[in-house]
Amino acid sequence: MIFGKGVFGARIHGGQMPLRVIQFSTGNVGRHSLRSIIQRPDLELVGVHANSSDKVGRDAAELCGLAEPTGVVATDDLDALVALRADCVVYTSQAETRPDVALKEITAFLSAGTNVVGTSLVWLVYPPHADAWLRDPLAAACAEGGTTMYVNGIDPGFSGDLLPLAALSLTERAESILVQEICDYGSYDDAEFTGVSFGFGTTPDIVPTLFLPGVLASIWGGPVQLLADELGVVVDEMRERHETWTAVDTIECTMMTVAPGEVAAVRFAVEGIVDGRPAIVMEHVNRLTSAAAPEWPVPPEGRPGVHRVVINGTPGIEINTHVGNDHTDHNEAGVIATAAKAVNAIAAVCAAPPGLISLRDLPVSQVRGLMR
């Protein structure tokens, strides 16, 4: 270990200097976290990683839509970024389809003394649930560098951990928990990953990645297990279910064009079975147009999307959360929220004990510096 958490501890806790941060990738999520890092007085951008050659050498401000140059230019040199010995790297590069590469990149930072806050490798939203092939090398890197890694977002993440825990704090008894994302994805520009993973624009006989046995549980089973551990109950089994809805007419949307007979909506869930009943359920209902699958659950008040928690208990509780406003599309707002969840956690992660952590290991409040 060259620089571990202890080296930067006095500076972090003394408040004399901003935390030095690297942004890794500038795609859908990364451009928003990059902008947030630049604009926050408690953070100092010291490096930016870009995957595409057309972004290398460009100023960070240009890559996230800001006018005033930062003097920090994007690079694809991993070793140079690791050598900066930053306090934290915000890792938003798409990793689920390239986990081996992502592991190499992330472990390089962790081993060298740089903490990691991420929005990808979503299996790590609750590390105890993650498979050993992923968890073990990262944990070893944390031990070597004296560093911490935290992965979260809006879903998986906020909607399946912080939101239901807030609702549960108001109950005296909970019989079941339902967490839902119900969203029109039509304006979401992510055909290459979300489109392919969900099977949008394919015929129902083609099984998308998400619906392969075990994949849903590997992702949303983490939040199920986190809630079970918080509640002190044992999940006997995790069940997966999924179904599709095909278009009747041609659908034109930002993500793609869907022909009649092709998948335009999906509904899937992971059910945590406790004492023989589905007690903790994570469900998605995602459409490429609000007119698709009218028989499935829809957001309230005609909204395009909702993250919802329903507690069946004493008392019963339902919380509906919506992102976006008159100036920001709900899908774009969801991406901004995902980026914010990572950036807002930087200080807490830098102050946390070394290792792979989840929401359970961090303070509830991570909002300092937001009102400006």
Residue ranges of model-derived segments:
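N-terminal glycine-/serine-/threonine-rich beta1-alpha1-beta2 phosphate-ribose binding loop
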Residues: 2-112, 232
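Active-site-lining helix/loop region of Rossmann-like oxidoreductase modules
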Residues: 24-25, 168-296, 305-309, 332
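Hydrophobic beta-strand scaffold residues
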Residues: 45, 116, 148-149
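Alpha-helical support elements that line or immediately flank enzyme active sites
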Residues: 158-169
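C-terminal helical cap and adjacent loop that interface with cofactors, partners, or active-site loops
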Residues: 290-291, 298-372
